[in-house]
Amino acid sequence: METIKQILNSKSLYTIKSGSTVKDTVNFLAEKNIGLVPIIDNTGKVLGVFSERDLVKRVISKDLDIYLTKVDDVMTKDLIIAKIDESPQECLTKMKNNKIRHILVIDNEKLVGIISIKDLLELNIQDMKETIEVLHNYIYAR
């Protein structure tokens, strides 16, 4: 089974600086084709995350001006994190229990990546395919 570290090796990590406008952040999400971005301060410390869901629930539904509103004012600050050595199943359980689609991955107190529920489900599908192949070969081996 693939590990969290292996999944992250194939992914880029993008961040946005604190103080950015919602408009700039949304443009960045669209440009990078991502659904969530960590918001960092000048030292690289993660202050929160901004997601498509934050845009809908905290900006659009409240008729806030995306050109004037700072992402810091509407980002999610209560973060659910995973450590790099956690199993994919542990990450999936955290995501399910907290009803989130992305989880930040930390190694030695440093942000090293983001895992999405899609990443974990694709991993589960691959594992199931491998199990089916092994069982098929066992059952139909000559």
Task: Tell what function each PLM region has.
Residues 1-11, 51-81, 85-96, 117-142:
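Tandem CBS (Bateman) regulatory domains
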